[in-house]
Amino acid sequence: PYKIVMFNHLDFCENLEQFYELFNFFAEPMELNNFRSCDTADYKSFHDMKYLSAQLKDIAENGSLDDKRVLVYCQPVRNVNAGNYDTAEALMRLNLKDTGMVYPNRFIPLAEKNGYIHKLSMIILNKTCRAIREFQDEGYQLSRVSVNFSISELSNKNFMEEFRQIVERNGVDFHTIAVELTESRNDTEYELVLDRVMQFKSLGVCTYLD
């Protein structure tokens, strides 16, 4: 079996480590016994990935729950029975200096791969709680806003305590937050999800499986 990646120039590779990183970036998604030739657009996508990875690392290491590079948008959900919008879903975006707005399909896989997703989720939870507080102060009646979490985050031993502290710090009721979880893929994940669902229920938090 083989994978062949051809480059028309490698001027920006300063050492062997950078070359391996470049090669793996293009080779990993390839099928076996195949080859590809890289052009200028491919090099740009590699550099964009490097920049995005560096920004995600900085966001995670900085640790601020108020990081301005992470944005939350609340998308209203219509209640067809009541005929109004009474819930919403929190959507995450990044706004970076060199690239502008970045959508989840570009940064979520990188964040999960490199272990940064938990910090992003806690930032979104914090900003969602703040948005709920602002909605309430302005007289909007929202039953709850859902926030997405990945299965991998649930195994963090501090997950529930961090979740609880963020919600309480923002002064919102637990029932105004809903947690949307990725569907479990094996028995181990199923047990973990079930345990967390029961913990959320004890707090008054509604949970959904995506």
Segments predicted by a language model, with ranges:
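Conserved long alpha-helical elements within nucleotide-processing catalytic cores of c-di-GMP signaling
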Residues: N24, N105-P109, H118, M198
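Conserved ATPase "switch" residues in P-loop NTPase domains
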Residues: S64, Q136, K201
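Hydrophobic "anchor" residues on beta-strands that sit immediately upstream
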Residues: L71, R144, T176, C206-T207
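C-di-GMP signaling machinery
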Residues: L10-L71, A111-G115, E153-M160, V193-L194
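Active-site core of bacterial EAL-family cyclic-dinucleotide phosphodiesterase domains
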Residues: D42-L110, N148, L209
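Short beta-strand/loop segments at the ligand-binding rim of alpha/beta enzyme cores
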Residues: V197-D210
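Catalytic core of bacterial c-di-GMP phosphodiesterases, primarily the EAL and HD-GYP domains
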Residues: Y2-L16, D39, A82-T87, Y116-L192
